[in-house]
Amino acid sequence: MLKRIDRYIIKKFLGTFFFMLGLIMLLSVVFDISEKLSEFISNKAPLKEIFFEYYVTFVLYYGNTFSSMIIFLSVIWFTAKMAQDTEIIPIWFSGRPVSRFLRPYFIGATFLTILSLILNHFIVPRTNKVRLAFEEKYYRDILTVDDYQAEYPGNELVYFSNYSGQDQRIHDLTIQKWSKDQEPIYFLRARFAQNIPGTNKWRLTDYYEKDYRFPKGLLIHGRSKDTTFSYRIDEMAQRENAAQALTFSELKTAIEREKIKGSKLVPEFEIELHTRTAFPFATYILTIIGVSVASQKKRGGIGLDIAIGLFLVFVYIFAMKMLTVAATKVGLSTLIAVWLPNLLFAVIASIFYRRAQK
């Protein structure tokens, strides 16, 4: 059963977090508007779409992404304030262990962790679809892909020289298929190819087609042809942040599909999947560090605690970025790259916790 002090700390915890979250997101929106306003005006983006389709989803995405960091700073802020106001001293003199003092913090952290996990895996990906579609329409440069090559199930190799989102056409499409014995069974080359959006239907222009299963092979040339393939253009031509718009099940499916193709996007997709779980669980680690750092009254006041907190946040983000680069460029396991900062900071948290006990 929660005591008055527990309810007081939980109220302080959640209240400070949502206040800081709102303040930081407000500043983020202001800076983002100043950066993108000219593009919105030049591309004639409607005000309604800017607000509802972009900035509402913008706040959901970035607020949830950095929630563990904001929780950390919130814990340091209100705990240091309690320490400076000598609200914590009676708790220490009452003989309560540090673990009991941490109980309301962990209740608040658990609530925010569960909320973040639900948002990360199920809600934010759907709102990201709206946000990324808006960016594609009103802000980003036209998507282009050069020298695409991938292997699809059924020993099917697909290559094209160029794709432009402006006319949504593939240039110089080549498709080759082999049998299980690595014998060529099919060849297709088209000067242009266009995928009907949202379907597996394609329109080929100026194409050559050869099926080796016919006697001596039959070469067909035509001006135009409608056909179907097992893939779509949005699987071939996609930005690096495409994984942000995939739910948990969609992301798992996409990873398996990209692995078969030997795609360079596999590490990006795996990092996105692991990060959605690792970041929320960092809340517990950062909460322990925050309480341990800020629960003692210091001569430097709250400012010193905030400085320590900002330094640790910087180190955490730097470690995440370095290991992410190692996973995408050097081949480090994405699971290790995402979870290692949490493990390192768990060790740091245990050190701070032991010092707080003393």
Tell where the protein language model's regions lie, with residue ranges.
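Structural signature for solvent-exposed beta-strand/loop edge elements and short helix-capping sites
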Residues: Y152-Y207
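A short, polar/proline- and glycine-enriched secondary-structure boundary/capping micro-motif
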Residues: E183-Y186, Y212-G222
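Transmembrane alpha-helices
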Residues: M1-G154, G165, R213-P215, S230-K358
